[in-house]
Structure formats: C-alpha cells, structure tokens
Amino acid sequence: MKKIFLTLLLAAPALTLSAQVGKGGITPEMLEKIKSEQPNTAADRALRTALSGTSINQLAKNPNNPASSDTYFSHSVPSKGITDQQSSGRCWLFTGMNVMRAKMIKKYDLGAFQFSQSYSFFYDQLEKSNLFLQAVIDNAKKPMDDKLVEWLFKNPLSDGGTFCGVQDVMMKYGAVPAEVMPESYNANNTSRMSSIIALKLREYGLALRQGAAKGQKPAVLEKRKVEMLGTIYRILSTCLGEPPTTFKWTMKDAKGRPISTKEYTPKSFYEEYVGEDLKNNYVMLMNDPSRPYHRTYTIDMDRHSYDGAQWTYLNLPIEEIKPLAIASIKDSTMMYFSCDVGKFYDSKTGVLSTENFDYATLFDTDFPMDKADRIRTFASASSHAMTLMAVDLDAEGKPTKWKVENSWGPNSGVAGHLIMTDKWFDEYMFRVVIEKRFVPEKLLKLYNHEPTRLPAWDPLFSEDK
C-alpha cells in the first residue's frame, strides 16, 4: 500500500502538468521539440551575450545607410522657432498651429511667434468631455456591452487628436499668443490630469445611463450634463489656468521692434491674424492600401467636439499624394502631416529610413507584411503629427527624401526636425492635410462624395500624439 502511495505521489506532478495542457496548448513534447531545434552555434551564443547588455536597435543598426548624413533639400519652407509638446500627446495641436503661425510670421515678418497651445488645449479637453457625455446620452438605451457603448467607456478622453481638432477649436474659440496663456506644468505633462478627468467622465457616464434607465428624459439628462461639465471646467482651469476673454498684445517684427499694440478677444485675434476658413479650405488625404482608392471615408466618433468636424478623408495612392505635397512646398506652404513615427526611427540622427535597422538579419527571419497587412492587423497606424516643410528632388523631379518640423524641442532630431527617406514616406506616411488650391478639380469632386462610414474601432481610428 505504501509503495502504491509513493508511486502515485511521484507521478502526481506529471499527471497534473499533463492535465493542465488543453487542446491547442503547448505540451511538454512540443516545448522540447521547439527547444531542440534552436540554433546554438558560436555566433548564436555571441549574439545572445551581446543582446543581454545591448539594445536591439544598436545591434541592428546599419552603419552604411547614406540617409544618415544627407541633410540637403532642394525645396524648403522657412520656419522660425521649434516648439516642444514635452510629455503630452498634443502633437496634432502643435502641428496645426505651426502651419498657421508660419503664414502669420511670413505675412508680418515676425520672429519666432507661437500661438498658445494651452489655451486651445483647454477647450479641446472641454469639448471632448462634452462629446463623451452627449454620446452616452444618445446611446443610453443600448446595453453596456454594446460595442459602441463599450468603446466610449474605454475611450472617454484623450490628449491626442487630428487636424479636425485644430479646425474646431480655433474657429469656435479663437486663438491667443503663447505669452497671453503660457504653458503650465499640467499642459506639458498631461497624463495625470487626463486620467483624473477620464475617471470622472466614466463616473458621470454611468450616472447618466442610470438616470436614463430610471426613465429620465434626454432634456433632464442634458441638464445634468451641463452640471457635470462645470466640474470638468473647474479641473481644467485649476490645472491649466483660466482662459482669457480679452487681452492686450504688442506685435513685434523679426528684430524685436514694436509694430502695434491693441486690445483683442481670442476671436478677434484669430480673425485678424489667421482669418481662414479652416473647415472649407483644406482637404484631408490618406494613404490606406487596405481599402479601395479614390473613395472618401469617415470614421465614427473620430472628432474632437460633438458638433464639430469628423475625420473624413479621400484615400489616394501614395503616387498621387506626393505631387500635391511637392506643389505646396514649392509654394512655401507647410502641411499637417502624420505618420507611424516609431518605425525605423533613429533618434541619434533624426532620420526615418527603412534601411536604419536590419532586424531580419539579426533574428534570421523575414518581416514580409506590406503596408496594407500592417494596417489590417493593427501593426501600423498614424501615431504622430508633424509639419511637412521640405522635399529634395532629383534631376528628374522625383522626391528622394522629405523633412518635417517636429514638436519635440530644438535639441531633438536635426535641430528639431526629422528627415525621412522617400521609401519610408511610402511605407509609414498616413495623413496629409493640403489646401484645396493645390488639389485638382477631379480629386475635389471625389472628396465631396458621400463618404463610406467606418466604425470607431476601425484600425484607422488612431490619434496623433
């Protein structure tokens, strides 16, 4: 009996391990086969040793990539002053404002002028809070596990965005110079403030749903929403400061000499110095090879305000986007541009090139997915906005590389700029916003077609940060 007990006791771990492996799981035999097939040459052991104390990118770096040293550009839009979004996801706002400020600097021969990002960000966060709460009211009768309702509560608020936010906030609330409402700590470091507001929004969203379940009418819920927004406003003003309603500002030229001193409201300042219909003067273009080209698409909930513009874009082959961007640069007009900036980015040189790192050789495996497959599988999407402002053309007028003005401060990249090869542009460029005057009439007609609606959880719902 004792021998039987000991035998069972010794066999128990093996039986338990075997019982834990269900169909489709990794069995001990499978694991042993995988391990036995691993290469173990001297080179493999040396590589493992090297990677134990070195970054992957450092070992995969291609030292012979010519893109790392070529900083000449045949066509470039002048700019003054590099902005810095610091530890925030406001690149979309900095980029849109960089486009606007470049025009203002050129027109009035100013120095390194900046709009207040903090002022516009304040109202962006208030508008996004209202967007969430009103969407909760609109969908209050749907179950909590409805896909849209679930998406809303997963994404109540973000500091990221698109050019739509620039359109909405500047045209609705105007703009002010940076010195009128300067950056605060919580404008530069948004994560804690955003998480606190998001927590409050989820609480409020749940309360609105509970009110609807008790039979409260939409008018009652919307009245409660206004009270809730009062709390959000208080959090924002405590963290970012109270937005000015009037201010005095002295315009100075590039040499610092005063030009004029006037009283403004944010709206009058915008109308005098920007004065542009941002919602109707621009065309939003996308390169998404996972979907049919020459069609217009819009993504549900991909907007900054409830009554604002939704991200609606004309999908074009990359070969049709490039000539439009080149025409804009030749006209000294910058563009809102966004891409998947983390792919093949060499932070030491400020260069984006598909030849920067050779991961295939390092790990002895190919990475064959093309751009369309990367989009479909959520492996790549737009992640960061910058200002497209230079292109280098060869003798035949073909682009070889591009340059963007970034918002990571003057000490990052190439004096605050990033350089991308034309091949990288093909693979990881997603959005560019171009003035209509550079777009052919046939494309404008396509842009005005009724767009195909995509759900909020589509792979291309991605905010620039």
Tell me the role of every PLM-derived stretch.
Residues 93, 119-122, 168, 177-180, ...:
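Structural recognition of the beta-strand scaffold that forms the well-ordered cores
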Residues 87, 95-96, 100, 162-171, ...:
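Stable alpha-helical elements in mature extracytoplasmic
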Residues 21-81:
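N-terminal regions that are enriched for targeting/export leaders
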Residues 77-89, 151-157, 308-315, 324-325, ...:
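Second-shell loop/turn segments in exported
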Residues 117-247:
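Papain-like cysteine protease catalytic cores
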Residues 1-22:
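Bacterial Sec-dependent N-terminal signal peptides
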Residues 67-139:
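Post-signal peptide N-terminal segment of secreted/secretory-pathway proteins
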Residues 22, 215-465:
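Active-site signature of cysteine proteases
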